[in-house]
């Protein structure tokens, strides 16, 4: 971003570049009001320029070009520095969504002194001018990209500074400890009880625990917003695809009496009471595969099981348990910390399944009559506990960049603790604490890292 002058006035289309009812063009910078006054005329008095833009006011304006030819009738919204998104004077033009009008208006702004904005440059200016931090900027991008209600909510919480406040608390704690260390260094002769290595280590442990909580809570929030992974396993013709279709309430998977219809896994997203689930219908579970394709399908089914949060183990209740059923049960018993729901399918037929499953959560289902469907949906919902939703409402998520810094912060805290335990000189301990402070500062962008910042804003769309 440093290749662009922050003093420039920038303009960009904020809506898609296509024919539509309306289009919004945004302009920000010190010359925004001046440029707007050159091309904006009162719609009911086209010979009079609008040159007294007020804060948070709207104007019905006629846009005219340098030859005094009308371009469009628009709504002009004016917001004055510093109370804007960019903290700069900002003008927004709401025009008709003709590509001809969009091009003409953008060309007029550029001819009169504006510059076409770079990707994410409006958000970049909000960051540079202290309006938002890096974490908030990334949350704006996440909100734009969100594909479910929980993702949008989590992005808004983060955009409003939830993570930054947590990081600020950690850094404040470090700074308070540094003050004690520097006080001891500067006034060693003063006999006070304000400093001790034990007290310093205790404080490091608190900071460490807080970072660990941020990371672990983030994982739980991420599980919710990314979709709870549900793998459907079972032998061939147990009714896995029928269960898959029943949950979706539509015919997504091909259902057939021919063994091995599903060779690879199918996947779909579904929302149950606004909670996203990611369903995976897998290939039939065999003890012995007949060919390489079948073997690959079984391996992929196992991979889905390993990566899932919930496993739906489907058995044909109208048939005697066979070698493949027993093989599946043994596979499931070997898994650790898995939430498994056992389904006896075809409950509308005579029950013949004769294998006992110890301590199992078993649901009898008929995909023909839909009997048992409500119990299955309820069991899926029960996976999300009240504590999960409580954490979602109070905590936030971290992205890969933030997680990397937080994990590095944990390593740096261990160095601080080690040197304090071994009574290193306070100068050395203070140096390690400053490194820790800078690492955490990088999470919210309070420490400048130009290359990283440029990469973040380059991912934004133009006009944001």
UniProtKB/Swiss-Prot annotation:
EC number: 3.6.-.-
TrmE-type G domain ranges (all copies): 227-385
Residues annotated for GTP binding in this entry: 237-242, 256-262, 281-284
Transmembrane residue ranges: none
Pfam families linked to this entry: MMR_HSR1 (PF01926), MnmE_helical (PF12631), TrmE_N (PF10396)
Main location: cytoplasm
Cofactors (names): K(+)
Cofactor note (record): Binds 1 potassium ion per subunit.
Cross-referenced PROSITE patterns: G_TRME
CDD domains associated with the record: trmE, TrmE_N
Keyword Amino-acid biosynthesis: no
Residues where Mg(2+) binds: 241, 262
Keyword tags: Cytoplasm, GTP-binding, Hydrolase, Magnesium, Metal-binding, Nucleotide-binding, Potassium, tRNA processing
Lineage top rank: taxon: Bacteria
UniProt cross-references to Gene3D superfamilies, sorted A to Z: P-loop containing nucleotide triphosphate hydrolases, Probable tRNA modification gtpase trme, domain 1, tRNA modification GTPase MnmE domain 2
Annotated GO MF terms: GTP binding; GTPase activity; metal ion binding
Localization in the cell: Cytoplasm
UniProt-annotated binding residues for K(+): 237, 256, 258, 261
Entry's Gene Ontology BP terms: tRNA methylation; tRNA wobble uridine modification
Family recorded in the similarity comment: Belongs to the TRAFAC class TrmE-Era-EngA-EngB-Septin-like GTPase superfamily. TrmE GTPase family.
Biological role stated in the UniProt entry: Exhibits a very high intrinsic GTPase hydrolysis rate. Involved in the addition of a carboxymethylaminomethyl (cmnm) group at the wobble position (U34) of certain tRNAs, forming tRNA-cmnm(5)s(2)U34.
Subunit structure: Homodimer. Heterotetramer of two MnmE and two MnmG subunits.
Protein name: tRNA modification GTPase MnmE
Gene name of the encoded protein: mnmE
């Amino acid at each position: 971003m440093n290749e662009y002058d922050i003093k420039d006035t920038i303009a960009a289309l904020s809506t898609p570049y296509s024919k539509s009812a309306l289009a919004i063009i945004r302009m920000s910078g010190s010359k925004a009001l001046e440029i707007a006054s050159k091309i904006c005329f009162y719609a009911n008095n086209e010979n009079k320029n609008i040159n007294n833009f007020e804060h948070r006011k709207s104007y019905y304006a006629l846009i005219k070009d340098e030859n005094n030819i009308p371009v469009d009738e628009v709504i002009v919204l004016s917001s004055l520095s510093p109370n804007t998104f960019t903290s700069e004077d900002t003008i927004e033009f709401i025009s008709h969504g003709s590509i001809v009008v969009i091009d003409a208006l953008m060309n007029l702004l550029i001819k009169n002194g504006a510059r076409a904005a770079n990707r994410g440059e409006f958000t970049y200016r909000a960051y540079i001018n202290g309006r938002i931090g890096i974490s908030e900027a990334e949350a704006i991008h996440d909100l734009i990209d969100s594909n479910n209600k929980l993702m949008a909510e989590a992005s808004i919480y983060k955009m409003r500074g939830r993570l930054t406040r947590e990081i600020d608390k950690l850094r404040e704690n470090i700074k308070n400890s540094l003050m004690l260390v520097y006080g001891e260094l500067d006034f060693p002769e003063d006999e006070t009880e304000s400093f001790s290595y034990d007290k310093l280590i205790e404080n490091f442990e608190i900071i460490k625990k807080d970072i660990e909580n941020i990371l672990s809570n983030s994982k739980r929030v991420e599980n919710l917003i990314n979709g709870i992974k549900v793998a459907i396993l079972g032998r061939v013709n147990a009714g896995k695809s029928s269960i898959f279709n029943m949950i979706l309430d539509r015919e997504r998977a091909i259902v057939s009496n021919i063994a091995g219809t599903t060779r690879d896994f199918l996947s779909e997203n579904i929302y149950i009471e606004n909670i996203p689930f990611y369903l995976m219908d897998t290939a039939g579970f065999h003890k012995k595969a007949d060919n390489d394709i079948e073997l690959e399908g079984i391996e992929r089914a196992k991979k889905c099981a390993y990566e899932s949060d919930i496993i739906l183990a489907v058995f044909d209740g109208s048939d005697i348990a066979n070698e493949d059923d027993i093989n599946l049960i043994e596979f499931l018993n070997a898994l650790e910390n898995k939430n498994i729901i056992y389904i006896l399918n075809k409950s509308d037929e005579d029950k013949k399944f004769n294998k006992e499953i110890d301590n199992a959560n078993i649901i009898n289902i008929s995909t023909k009559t839909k009997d048992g469907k409500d119990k299955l949906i309820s069991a899926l919902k029960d996976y999300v506990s009240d504590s999960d939703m409580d954490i979602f409402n109070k905590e936030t998520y971290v992205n890969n960049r933030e997680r990397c810094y937080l994990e590095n912060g944990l390593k740096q805290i261990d160095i601080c603790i080690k040197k304090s335990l071994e009574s290193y000189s306070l100068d050395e301990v203070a140096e390690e604490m400053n490194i820790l402070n800078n690492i955490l500062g990088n999470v919210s962008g309070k420490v400048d890292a130009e290359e990283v910042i440029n990469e973040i804003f380059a991912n934004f769309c133009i006009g944001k």
